[in-house]
Amino acid sequence: MSFSHSFIFIVIFCMQSLAALLQNGFMATVLGREWVRSQGLPAGDMIMACLAASRFCLHGIAVLNNFLASAMFWTIKNYFSILWDFTNTVNFWFTTWLAIFYCVKISSFSHPIFFWIKWRISRSVPRLLLGSLIIGGLSAISSATGNTIALQMAACENYTIYYKMMAFYLYYFRCHAMLMWVIPFFLFLLSIILLMFSLYRHLEQMRYHRPRTHDYSTQAHIMALKSLAFFLIFYTSYTLLLTVSVAHVINVHGSWHWAWEVVTYMGISLHSTILILSNTKMRKALKIKFPDLCIPRS
């Protein structure tokens, strides 16, 4: 790729990151103010506030990491890579909890276990969020340990031992990444499948009853599915692209690096837009802040 093409993708990446920082900063600020003012938030808004804050940090660290790598500041980049690992892991889990929360609250399954989860989920959200931070911390510690060992091995004069240890480190890092990303991803998929099945059952039941003018249950299903269906695409692409990068299936550290970064982070950037447009509080705050702004309905 020529320098001009690389420069274009650098500009696109910076603009995309700036938009994501503004979007997530806006969500975190609006919900954070309400959290402080009312001494609490509904469980769904609490997850969304934490998700917005984690994505704000994730995009900021991604920008720093990419420019530090371009400037060859590898030592400083290694420290920020540990922070990126923490925020990325936390972001995966916060996203999964939001999907599970939607599924539990909106779905209409009658199994006793499901009723028990529905009854407990709101009160369990603070502990789930704290657990996500703990998992992110453990992930960061594991990443820091691996980086330290890799740096020590780089100074080893025995090349046979060096190559064996580096091969082990790469295998360890890939397994670590897969464990931290794949588990929440499959929980997210399960939540969407259950929610879609619940909507299908609800629509089938409606065929045998007289249609109501305002079917709020169906509307709730459709609104959640619109948000989750779009994000299923974005979240899957983000997970797959990260997996490909870690597995080194494609060499993305060359001239195509910036194009790869644009595509990778595009998914979660677009999902932040969907979250703002599908949330009543966010739409209201946008309307107050920008009265002349035409906001499309979700």
Swiss-Prot record:
Keyword terms: G-protein coupled receptor, Glycoprotein, Membrane, Receptor, Sensory transduction, Taste, Transducer, Transmembrane, Transmembrane helix
Cytoplasmic side: 28-55, 118-128, 198-229, 279-298
Membrane topology, from the record: Multi-pass membrane protein
Compartments, as annotated in UniProt: Membrane
Glycosylation sites: 158
Residue intervals passing through the bilayer: 7-27, 56-76, 97-117, 129-149, 177-197, 230-250, 258-278
Extracellular face residues: 1-6, 77-96, 150-176, 251-257
One GO molecular-function entry: G protein-coupled receptor activity
Role played: Putative taste receptor which may play a role in the perception of bitterness.
Note from the entry: Several bitter taste receptors are expressed in a single taste receptor cell.
Protein name: Taste receptor type 2 member 134
